[in-house]
Amino acid sequence: MFSKHDQLQGYDDELLAAMDAEDRRQEDHIELIASENYASKRVMQAQGGGLTNKYAEGYPGKRYYGGCEHVDKVERLAIDRARQLFGADYANVQPHSGSSANAAVYLALLNAGDTILGMSLAHGGHLTHGAKVSSSGKLYNAVQYGLDTATGLIDYDEVERLAVEHKPKMIVAGFSAYSKTLDFPRFRAIADKVGALLFVDMAHVAGLVAAGLYPNPIPFADVVTTTTHKTLRGPRGGLILARANEEIEKKLNSAVFPGAQGGPLMHVIAAKAVCFKEALEPGFKDYQAQVIRNAKAMAEVFIGRGYDVVSGGTDNHLMLISLVKQGLTGKAADAALGAAHITVNKNAVPNDPQSPFVTSGIRIGTPAVTTRGFREGECRELAGWICDILDDIDNPEVGERVRGQVGEFCRHFPVYAD
């Protein structure tokens, strides 16, 4: 039998060393990947508990296994809190990820070969919005809209023109690298004009939506998905939301289980419930407001130092920096900043001359540094360091200096304080 005192130390030191090294990296590096954040110890406590052991195929009150009376309560808590947080009538907390939530939406509401209209990956969309390499681009006839290259903003006239031309069954609104506010009423009007469903993927901005600092898509969309990490600061997982519609609710439930998944991850659902409770607290709005202020402060520095911020600035938690003018690649910038313990990700920019493996841009987000306690002053200083490195990318002395400054910041702003 197992002992309550079993631990990794002394049993699997090789694995433990890698895990400890990652913990140290998170403390010693500044995290600017827009899709990453730090979960609270409460969230991790819930995810690391005994619910890991429980199989619970089905939904609360309608399980295919016995012994589910307690996990039913856990899942109902998560559902009720998600509905309250976003003002939704329906919530499904079982998707294992944002991508699996999106796949379930397609499975529920589309047939193979149906036309979908989504944002191009090259212009800031997501793989699951119809990219050719994704199942969403292989199973469905995916048409892509993008940005007006003159303004860096979504070209809603193009969206409408493509919708009228291709008559999609579904229009997808959402992004992975767009720094401005989506016009949900305009998307709804376009969808209604051509008789399409409107599906919103708000994975990146869900925390801002929950705080009332970004428009809520629930009143406009037929279905909404999100991840539960990123700006929500929860565990890695997915969530589907909708207004009351019995037909759509039944289709969505069936698409998640048994259509796309088997047993739900009850320990992750418990962690989602904690995350939603944290997001319902008054302080969560203060956090999200600081996320936006920090992003705006960084964008101002980049623009002031001569870097092109796609779309001209940011309304949310992220920004996309084009390095075309500087003659740099995203890959080189990613590596140089990483050597200075600043973590970003290379990212394609509109009309990128480089391949997706090289790119001409970097994406930067402020959720994680804001969780650490950074405010505008720290973020302006940080943006300046990034510019220092990119301005003199082949000078190792600059990188070494910045790495020392990063270390001071990280010691002053620990991820998990004592």
UniProtKB/Swiss-Prot annotation:
Pfam families: SHMT (PF00464). Keywords: Amino-acid biosynthesis, Cytoplasm, One-carbon metabolism, Pyridoxal phosphate, Transferase. (6S)-5,6,7,8-tetrahydrofolate binds at L121, G125, H126, L127, S355, P356, F357. The modification N6-(pyridoxal phosphate)lysine is found at K230. It comes from the Bacteria. GO terms for molecular function: glycine hydroxymethyltransferase activity; pyridoxal phosphate binding. Its main location: cytoplasm. It catalyses: (6R)-5,10-methylene-5,6,7,8-tetrahydrofolate + glycine + H2O = (6S)-5,6,7,8-tetrahydrofolate + L-serine. It is found in: Cytoplasm. InterPro entries: PyrdxlP-dep_Trfase, PyrdxlP-dep_Trfase_major, PyrdxlP-dep_Trfase_small, Ser_HO-MeTrfase, Ser_HO-MeTrfase-like, Ser_HO-MeTrfase_PLP_BS, SHMT-like_dom. The record marks H229 as: Plays an important role in substrate specificity. It is an enzyme of class 2 (transferase). Pathway: One-carbon metabolism; tetrahydrofolate interconversion; Amino-acid biosynthesis; glycine biosynthesis; glycine from L-serine: step 1/1. Its EC number is 2.1.2.1. Its cofactor is pyridoxal 5'-phosphate. GO terms for cellular component: cytoplasm; cytosol. Coiled coil: none annotated. One of its GO terms (biological process) is glycine biosynthetic process from serine. SUPFAM superfamilies: PLP-dependent transferases. Homodimer. PANTHER family: SERINE HYDROXYMETHYLTRANSFERASE. HAMAP family: SHMT (MF_00051). Belongs to the SHMT family. Catalyzes the reversible interconversion of serine and glycine with tetrahydrofolate (THF) serving as the one-carbon carrier. This reaction serves as the major source of one-carbon groups required for the biosynthesis of purines, thymidylate, methionine, and other important biomolecules. Also exhibits THF-independent aldolase activity toward beta-hydroxyamino acids, producing glycine and aldehydes, via a retro-aldol mechanism. This is Serine hydroxymethyltransferase 2. It comes from Pseudomonas aeruginosa (strain ATCC 15692 / DSM 22644 / CIP 104116 / JCM 14847 / LMG 12228 / 1C / PRS 101 / PAO1).
